[in-house]
Amino acid sequence: MLKIFSSLCLRTVSGLLLVLGLTLSAVALAESQVDNSAPLTIAVAANFSAPMKLLASEFEQQTGRPVRLSIASSGKLFAQIQHGAPFDVFLSADQDKPQRLVEQGLAVSGSQFTYAVGELALWSSQQHIDPEQTLRQGNFRKLAIANPKLAPYGLAAEQALVSLDLTEASKSKIIFGESIGQAFQFVASGSAELGFVARAQVIAAGSSDSLSKGSVWFLPNNLYAPIRQDAVLLVRAKTDSGAGQFLEFLQSEYAKNTIQNFGYGSISVDAKGSQ
C-alpha cells in the first residue's frame, strides 16, 4: 500500500511540475512574441511634436511599422507611464524623468540618450514689436509660460526671468499652460501678448499667418540651464524589435538633420544622456 501511495505521489508531483513548466514556457513565449504589426506607441514632449510627426512618417515608410503618438507635457506623460500607460518609447523634454523611470524599473537601463537640445524663445503674435524690450519694460498684460512643474521649458522660462531680474515684476501677469504647446496657443489666440515657447515651435509655425504677423526674441543660452531632451525605451517594449529600431532611427543622420532643421542645438559629447 505504501509503495502504491508513494508511486501515486510521485506521479502527481511530476504531473504538476510538467504543467508548471509548460505554463512558464507559455508565458515566456507570449512575452517574446511581440506583434510587430501593432502600432508603436510613443510618448512625446509637446515641444517636439512638429519634428516628431515628420520622423514618425519617415520611420513608417522605411519600416512599414505604424506609429501612434501621444503628445503632452513631459510631466503628464511621466505620470501616465508611472500609472501603467501603454507606451513603448518616451521622448521627454529633460533628462531627469527618463532617468527616474530607469531607477523605478519602468524603463530599460542603458537605453537612455539625448536626442535634442532645446532652445527658448519669447514670442508675440503682434507685428513690429521688440519682445525683449516689451518684457523688460512690462508693457504687456499677460505672459504665457508652460507649467514649470510639468514642462521643462516652463522651468527654463522661470530661470530666464530670474536671470533677467524680472520674476517679481512679471509674477502677476503670468498665465500657465499645461504644456509648451498650450503656452504657444495662448499667444497665438491673443490670450497673452507674450509667451516663452520653444524655438522649434516658432520655426515649425514659420509659414502660418499667426507667425508671419508676429515677433520673436531667441533668448541667449546663458539665461537658462541647457534643455537636454532624452529618449528611453520603456520596459513593456524591451522585447519589441521595432521599438529598438525606432531609437536607432532617432540617432540616424536623417533624424539628426531633421531635428537641427527645427532649431534644436547640436548634441555635443557632454550633452549625451546615460548610455
Model-found features: residue ranges?
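Bacterial N-terminal signal peptides
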Residues: 11-25
